[in-house]
Each structure stands twice: as C-alpha cells, then as structure tokens.
Amino acid sequence: MIRRLAILLAMFVVAGAGACRESLDSGAACPALCPAQSVAIRDTLINPVLVFDSTYVGYPERGREQAMLLAARGDTLETRGVIRFDTLTAFYVPTGDTARTITRVDSSRVRLVLDRAKARLPAQVTFDVYDVDDSTAADTSAAAVLALFTADRRIGGTSFLRDSLKDTVAVPLSDSAVLEKIVNKRRLRLGLRASGNGPLSVRVGTVESGSAAEVSYRPNADTSAKPLLVGPISSTPAGADFPEIRSDLTDYTLVAKYAVQQDANTMSVGGIPGRRAYLRFVLPAYIVDSTTVVRATLRLTQRPLAFGDALDTITIHAHVALAGPHVTDLRRATNVISAPGLLVNDSLLVTPADSGVRSIEMFGLLRAWAGQRVLVNPPPQAIVLRASPESVLPAEARFYSTTAGATLRPVMRISYIPRATFGVP
C-alpha cells in the first residue's frame, strides 16, 4: 500500500513539472501557472517624442508676482518696482483733542521688506524713489510708467553698505512731496529703483507675499507723536468690473531692460518676465494601448546661456496640461495646468550656464494618458515647464526644441512590459 502511494505521489510531481515546461512553450499561460518566472522588460527610444513645442512669455500676470525684483545687471537686465498708495490719511487726533486736518508732515518714509535669499548685493546699495503718478498717462502701460522715472520726479532715496543692509529698510521720502499729495487729495505712487557699484538683484515683499511696503509720516513736527501708517491700495482702473486688476496693480514689477539674446531651435523657462514652455507629445499607439509602462524618462538637452552664474539657480517643474482639445489658444492653455508634483513628481535644478542632458521621470503620467484614451474628448498629451518661483529671479534656462537636430532635440526612453493575453494553453 505504501509503495502504491509513493508511486502515485511521484506521478503528480512529474505531471506538475511537465505542466510548467508546457507553459513556457505555450506562451501567455505561463505567468498564470508559473508566477515565479521572470518578466521581460523592453526598452525603446522615441525620437522625436514631441509633435510641437513653444515658449510663451509674461507669467504670472503683472502684479501677481510673489515679490518685486529690483535688479541692475549692467546692460543686460534692469527691473524696477511700483507701489500704489492711492489713499492717504488726511486727519489725525492729538491726545485729548478732536480730529485735525494735516497741514504738516515730518519723517516721511517708505518701509520695504527685503528677501535676501539668492540676492546679489554689491558693496553699496542705493534705493531711489520716484513719483510715478500721472493722471494723463495710461497707468496700465509699462512704457508710460517707465517714462516717469526721471531725475525731476525723484522724491526720496538712501544708500546702505552691504553689511548694514537688514531685512527691513526705511527709505526717506520728501516731506513736501507727501504733504502735497495729502493736501490736494492726490495719489502717492512710488517707483522703486535699486543700483550699486556692481551687479545687483534683490526681492522686495508684496501684498501677495504678506510683506507689503508701508508708508509712514508724522502729522506734525512733534517727534513724540506716533507716526501714521498707510498701506498700499490701488483705485484704478475704476469700476465694478475691474477689482482683480486694481488688486494686481497695487504693487508690481516693471521690466526696463532684458537684453538676453534669443536662440533659434530652443525653448525657454524662467527669466524676467517669466517664460513657460508648452510641450505636446506624440506617442506610438502600441506603447499606450498594449503595454504596461514601468519607466518613462523625458530627456532634454540644455543649451548654456551666457547670462547668469552659479548663484542664479532655477527650479523647473513639469505641470500636466489640463486644457481640453477645444482650447486652441495655447498661451491660455499654459495657465490651465496641474499643481506641481501631480503625476510628474520629478523636477530640475539648473543654472543658466549649465549644459548637457536633463531627465524628467514621467511614467505615472503616461499611465494616466493610457486611461484617458477611452474619453470622447481626451485632453492633449502635453506638459508645461514652469519655473518656481516665477518672474522673481533673473534666471532663465534654455533647452533644445523639437526643431533642433536629432541628437539635441527632446527624446523619451520608455521601459515597458507587453501585456499578456491569457487563454487556453
């Protein structure tokens, strides 16, 4: 009896081994019967991987920057700032008395909060303040406002040694200029300009960052009197239809000069004003429909830019383009994007002078695109490259575009597993 059981057990072992050998020869049934078998991963390089790319300029919208950049970098870059104080306090209440009209001011100042992270400061820094209010000029025109930065309109300023420059600075203003605005109920609009004995760039806090500038003045010559504090506010453009524009124009950056040479066959990210690159992909149907993507690496070749140095680093995020196929204005489409890190967790940290291949992992996004193919109107397979922060640092990165040569243009390396079709062995 024992001998018969041993023979029967041996037959089962042989049958099982035969089944596995048969599975290897029968193809698709093997993974189900023999899960311990290794899975073959295939690689492919898609070149070109983009059907289209383009660079769009002017991000974010004026006044929505997280800081105002004051920069003076020789004949290449110069930026200035504008802060609007369209409502000034015209009355004060002395101790134990009733309200009085202000007829004299003293110790007028504008307080600026500086963000010195990644700032470039020469040995001496000078801040000049100009009256840039003109009721006859188009106050939404950058050129019209820049024309008001003239010597006869300078109403304040001061200089600091680099070692004495703190995170908060008080720049003196002309008392007579401030009083004239108060008495005549006029707007106080300040234009800021920074200069030094070398290349300079520093960020100034804004309403958006929660560290807005502030004007202060005493309502009389009594040094013991408490200064009156006035926050920024914009009253134009007037009307109930423009509240967001008024808010944006409360404080903003003006680009007086950006003379960085443009290159053919490239796309740009960052810079002043901010640039974004829109990349639309063309992926083979068999990759999207018939495989499981385990890795997808977008390779971009960076073109070195002469402007900038090792201090001008820039972080670049790849955002998923969310605008549907009916949005044909691609500049608008670059505003309809995902939050950073959604489906594309990777980012780049580069300097303008860098060169070589930069890689962005995108396998999660490719899997999402595969799931969207069942939609009636799936969104385009596209991403937007965007600097972070945007339009507050003078760093710009450039990459070769799809119109460049085959060895320089964007490519994608994909590792995938062919999907098995299970059936009867």
Regions found by a protein language model. Give the residues of each.
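Acidic, glycine-enriched active-site microenvironments
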Residues: 10-11
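Secreted, disulfide-rich extracellular signaling modules
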Residues: 2-6, 17-425
